[in-house]
């Protein structure tokens, strides 16, 4: 709502109600998250739109993020790089399941509130206009659901709750692979030094949403972190 009336790539940003006054022949749901796509479809249908919908997220054949993770996992195994795997921002566990399958012999530490975004992480998002995130977004998950998605659930260690509080007790861990998909600035900024300082030589951090227009905080946190340590992110 805060972006209505503004422009993106020269195109006006309209409310769903106003956009339908233009009688579109087709509506494109320009999100990759299936839950958000379903919410958008439901909203459009409730407003009376009965035309065709194009969902690019459902058409993805090649997932560059998953392919990159598998390539890194293969290198970690081939080079016998020591350490655990971890993910911050698990949601329903789809990517965690891929990590679990690619590194089947490693403990996999999973950090998530499992209750969606927390209000305490949203002040900076609003003040800097980093996202339109709301408390409770991505709450449609549970630890049980994630565990059922994992091919090797016996290797999973769950850390439910607010990050970085949930990192307490993990200070002695060392990591070979870490996925950071927290979306927001505050948890991403908190996670980067904690995992970087515990990354084994040859290990990898994979950061999601670095160039996202929806969640700008992850990229901002990464740029600030790299600048402070003279690190080149690739």
Where are these regions (language model features)?
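Glycine-rich, N-terminal phosphate-binding loop of Rossmann-like dinucleotide-binding domains
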Residues: 31-32, 182
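Internal alpha/beta domain cores that form substrate/cofactor-binding pockets in large enzymes
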Residues: 12, 16-22, 35-57
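S-adenosylmethionine/decaboxylated-SAM
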Residues: 52-63, 70-74, 78-234
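Low-complexity, intrinsically disordered regions enriched in charged/polar residues
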Residues: 34, 63-66
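Short, conserved catalytic or adaptor-binding loops enriched in Gly and charged residues
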Residues: 6, 45-46, 147-152
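A solvent-exposed beta-alpha-beta segment
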Residues: 1-31
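Short, charged/polar "capping" segments at the starts of alpha-helices
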Residues: 2-8, 34-40, 119
């Amino acid at each position: 709502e805060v972006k209505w009336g503004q422009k993106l790539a020269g195109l006006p940003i309209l409310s769903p109600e106003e956009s339908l006054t233009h009688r579109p022949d087709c509506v494109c749901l320009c999100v990759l998250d299936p839950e958000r796509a379903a919410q958008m479809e439901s909203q459009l249908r409730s407003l009376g739109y009965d035309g065709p919908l194009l969902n690019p997220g459902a058409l993805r054949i090649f997932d560059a993020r998953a392919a990159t993770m598998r390539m890194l996992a293969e290198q970690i195994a081939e080079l016998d790089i020591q350490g655990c795997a971890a993910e911050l921002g698990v949601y329903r566990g789809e990517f965690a399941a891929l990590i679990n399958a690619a590194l089947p012999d490693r403990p996999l530490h999973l950090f998530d509130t499992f209750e969606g975004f927390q209000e305490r992480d949203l002040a900076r998002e609003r003040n800097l206009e980093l996202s339109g995130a709301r408390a409770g977004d991505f709450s449609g998950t549970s630890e049980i659901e994630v565990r059922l998605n994992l091919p090797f659930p016996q290797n999973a260690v769950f850390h439910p709750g607010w990050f970085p509080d949930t990192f307490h007790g993990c200070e002695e861990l060392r990591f070979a692979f870490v996925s950071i998909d927290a979306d927001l600035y505050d948890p991403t900024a908190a996670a980067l030094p904690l995992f970087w300082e515990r990354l084994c030589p040859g290990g990898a951090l994979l950061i999601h949403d670095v160039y996202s227009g929806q969640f700008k905080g992850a990229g901002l946190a990464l740029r600030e972190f790299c600048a402070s340590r003279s690190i080149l992110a690739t």
